[in-house]
């Protein structure tokens, strides 16, 4: 009875949560009765803690509504339900014959393999050991991405296959790819994990065709345990590469081998890529990596300074983080310049010193992002009139873009709430605060608003 009610509870959660939240936290759970207790099994500690912290009240409320005082007790555990452990697993799809020990590749490509031991080393050589989960600075902007990546590292080929990470440049997607690779190799040193840029895949295929080595190319890519491809959007308009990757993708998934892809945009928005590929990109889990919010930018600067052996005052970190907002790479580059100048001049790192060291960068940023620029960009994006930003109209088609513009002004400029309100037709600062909170809430609940906000930040920060 309780287990069947759990299926109904899943339906309730699917209605109340976003598709991404449901896929990441609820779908992996398994349920089984143990006496008068319903045990929910999570695949790992991270999922267990998250569900218990975020969703336990919704689950308890549902069971109380349905069963009253007869509602079962709830307990969480890690692993799979005992009854499932006794079931013989279905045989994995046959893996393509690698032929590593018989065939020597004829070209100097990623698949130039002579023997199996060398193959293992070759597969792992491009996973950067410096990129770990421990040194990935987590914030609201990348929390789901990191959580999904950690689960893939623990259970490659499992629930999130493929995992598709998308967002602007310099936001940490590549860091997460390497962190997953390092996690997989730590758990299984013999795992064949390949990371590459999409252009490398194209180059390998072209060389294979030129050297009549296409079969070796296929064997190589279809025999790996995990394939991570960065910037998949560069497959656009490369028909033969897309054709080969389509078959590689299918072969890997049939064998339960992990695939992770990254792009600068949502899968369906990638122009020049076949629909059948874009559809497959969304088969697993798709997660947005957004520009870091202020607190995360500060944490990134403090972590980088600590790694460099530099004492960075809090007020300096906040000064830089409030002015440089586009991506992690820009933040780290700015800090490197500050550190180099400090080492060269012997001067202490103060706000005045940073203002001088980053003069050109700060001037460019302040010139690019203004409230007026934000209003024009948002109005154009939503196809409304610029005058609507200042008007008193309250229809959703106008009010929602106006709220988005206010939230962006709060995040991307140094203007105070009253100053932002003045720029939007003399509105009160409480109106701006309400808009910021409303958009923050909608970014959690609405995929469309989340996408719009991320797209606008990329446009304004480029």
Swiss-Prot record:
<dbReference type="InterPro" id="IPR055199">
    <property type="entry name" value="Hda_lid"/>
</dbReference>
<dbReference type="Pfam" id="PF00308">
    <property type="entry name" value="Bac_DnaA"/>
</dbReference>
<dbReference type="GO" id="GO:0006270">
    <property type="term" value="P:DNA replication initiation"/>
</dbReference>
<dbReference type="Pfam" id="PF11638">
    <property type="entry name" value="DnaA_N"/>
</dbReference>
<keyword id="KW-0067">ATP-binding</keyword>
<feature type="region of interest" description="Domain III, AAA+ region">
    <location>
        <begin position="126"/>
        <end position="342"/>
    </location>
</feature>
<keyword id="KW-0446">Lipid-binding</keyword>
<dbReference type="GO" id="GO:0005524">
    <property type="term" value="F:ATP binding"/>
</dbReference>
<dbReference type="InterPro" id="IPR020591">
    <property type="entry name" value="Chromosome_initiator_DnaA-like"/>
</dbReference>
<dbReference type="Pfam" id="PF22688">
    <property type="entry name" value="Hda_lid"/>
</dbReference>
<protein>
    <recommendedName>
        <fullName>Chromosomal replication initiator protein DnaA</fullName>
    </recommendedName>
</protein>
<feature type="binding site">
    <location>
        <position position="173"/>
    </location>
    <ligand>
        <name>ATP</name>
    </ligand>
</feature>
<dbReference type="GO" id="GO:0008289">
    <property type="term" value="F:lipid binding"/>
</dbReference>
<dbReference type="InterPro" id="IPR024633">
    <property type="entry name" value="DnaA_N_dom"/>
</dbReference>
<dbReference type="GO" id="GO:0016887">
    <property type="term" value="F:ATP hydrolysis activity"/>
</dbReference>
<dbReference type="InterPro" id="IPR010921">
    <property type="entry name" value="Trp_repressor/repl_initiator"/>
</dbReference>
<dbReference type="GO" id="GO:0005886">
    <property type="term" value="C:plasma membrane"/>
</dbReference>
<dbReference type="InterPro" id="IPR027417">
    <property type="entry name" value="P-loop_NTPase"/>
</dbReference>
<dbReference type="Pfam" id="PF08299">
    <property type="entry name" value="Bac_DnaA_C"/>
</dbReference>
<feature type="binding site">
    <location>
        <position position="174"/>
    </location>
    <ligand>
        <name>ATP</name>
    </ligand>
</feature>
<dbReference type="InterPro" id="IPR013159">
    <property type="entry name" value="DnaA_C"/>
</dbReference>
<comment type="similarity">
    <text>Belongs to the DnaA family.</text>
</comment>
<keyword id="KW-0238">DNA-binding</keyword>
<feature type="region of interest" description="Domain I, interacts with DnaA modulators">
    <location>
        <begin position="1"/>
        <end position="84"/>
    </location>
</feature>
<dbReference type="GO" id="GO:0003688">
    <property type="term" value="F:DNA replication origin binding"/>
</dbReference>
<dbReference type="InterPro" id="IPR018312">
    <property type="entry name" value="Chromosome_initiator_DnaA_CS"/>
</dbReference>
<comment type="subunit">
    <text>Oligomerizes as a right-handed, spiral filament on DNA at oriC.</text>
</comment>
<keyword id="KW-0547">Nucleotide-binding</keyword>
<dbReference type="InterPro" id="IPR001957">
    <property type="entry name" value="Chromosome_initiator_DnaA"/>
</dbReference>
<dbReference type="InterPro" id="IPR038454">
    <property type="entry name" value="DnaA_N_sf"/>
</dbReference>
<dbReference type="GO" id="GO:0005737">
    <property type="term" value="C:cytoplasm"/>
</dbReference>
<dbReference type="InterPro" id="IPR003593">
    <property type="entry name" value="AAA+_ATPase"/>
</dbReference>
<feature type="binding site">
    <location>
        <position position="170"/>
    </location>
    <ligand>
        <name>ATP</name>
    </ligand>
</feature>
<keyword id="KW-0235">DNA replication</keyword>
<dbReference type="GO" id="GO:0006275">
    <property type="term" value="P:regulation of DNA replication"/>
</dbReference>
<feature type="binding site">
    <location>
        <position position="172"/>
    </location>
    <ligand>
        <name>ATP</name>
    </ligand>
</feature>
<feature type="region of interest" description="Domain II">
    <location>
        <begin position="84"/>
        <end position="125"/>
    </location>
</feature>
<feature type="region of interest" description="Domain IV, binds dsDNA">
    <location>
        <begin position="343"/>
        <end position="462"/>
    </location>
</feature>
<keyword id="KW-0963">Cytoplasm</keyword>
<comment type="function">
    <text>Plays an essential role in the initiation and regulation of chromosomal replication. ATP-DnaA binds to the origin of replication (oriC) to initiate formation of the DNA replication initiation complex once per cell cycle. Binds the DnaA box (a 9 base pair repeat at the origin) and separates the double-stranded (ds)DNA. Forms a right-handed helical filament on oriC DNA; dsDNA binds to the exterior of the filament while single-stranded (ss)DNA is stabiized in the filament's interior.</text>
</comment>
<dbReference type="InterPro" id="IPR013317">
    <property type="entry name" value="DnaA_dom"/>
</dbReference>
């Amino acid at each position: 009875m309780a287990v069947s009610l759990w299926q109904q509870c899943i339906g309730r959660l699917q209605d109340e949560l976003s598709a991404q939240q449901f896929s990441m936290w609820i779908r992996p759970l398994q349920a089984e009765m143990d006496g008068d207790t319903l045990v929910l099994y999570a695949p790992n500690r991270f999922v267990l803690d998250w569900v218990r912290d975020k969703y336990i009240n919704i689950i308890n409320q549902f069971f109380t509504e349905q069963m009253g005082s007869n509602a079962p007790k709830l307990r969480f555990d890690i692993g799979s339900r005992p009854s499932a452990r006794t079931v013989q697993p279905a045989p994995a799809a046959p893996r393509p014959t690698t032929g590593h020990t018989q065939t020597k590749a004829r070209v100097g490509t990623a698949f130039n393999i002579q023997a199996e031991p060398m193959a293992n080393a070759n597969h792992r050589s491009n996973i950067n050991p410096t990129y770990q989960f421990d040194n990935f600075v987590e914030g609201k902007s990348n929390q789901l991405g990191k959580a999904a990546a950690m689960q893939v590292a623990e259970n490659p080929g499992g629930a999130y296959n493929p995992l598709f990470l998308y967002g602007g440049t310099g936001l940490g997607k590549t860091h997460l790819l390497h962190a997953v690779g390092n996690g997989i190799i730590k758990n299984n040193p013999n795992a064949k994990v390949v990371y590459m840029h999409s252009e490398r895949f194209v180059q390998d295929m072209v060389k294979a065709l030129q050297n009549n080595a296409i079969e070796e190319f296929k064997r190589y890519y279809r025999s790996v345990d995990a394939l991570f491809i960065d910037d998949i959007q560069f497959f656009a308009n490369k028909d033969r590469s897309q054709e080969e990757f389509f078959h590689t993708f299918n072969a890997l998934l049939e064998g339960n081998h992990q695939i992770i892809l990254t792009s600068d945009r949502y899968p369906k928005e990638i122009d020049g890529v076949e629909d059948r590929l874009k559809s497959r990109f969304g088969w697993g889990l798709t997660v947005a990596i957004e520009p870091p919010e202020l607190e995360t930018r500060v944490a990134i600067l403090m972590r980088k300074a600590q790694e460099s052996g530099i004492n960075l005052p809090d007020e300096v970190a906040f000064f830089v983080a409030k002015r440089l907002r586009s991506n992690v790479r820009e933040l780290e580059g700015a800090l490197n310049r500050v550190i180099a100048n400090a080492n060269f001049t012997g001067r202490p790192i103060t706000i005045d010193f940073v203002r001088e060291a980053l003069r050109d960068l700060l001037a460019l940023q302040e010139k690019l992002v203004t409230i007026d620029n934000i209003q024009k960009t948002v109005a154009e994006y939503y196809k409304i009139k610029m005058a609507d930003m200042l008007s008193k109209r309250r229809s959703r088609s106008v009010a929602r873009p106006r709220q988005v513009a206010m939230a962006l002004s709060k995040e991307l400029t140094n203007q105070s709430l009253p100053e932002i309100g003045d720029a939007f037709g003399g509105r009160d600062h409480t109106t701006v605060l309400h808009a910021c909170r409303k958009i923050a809430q909608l970014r959690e609940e609405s995929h469309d608003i989340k996408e719009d906000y991320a797209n606008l930040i990329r446009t304004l920060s480029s």
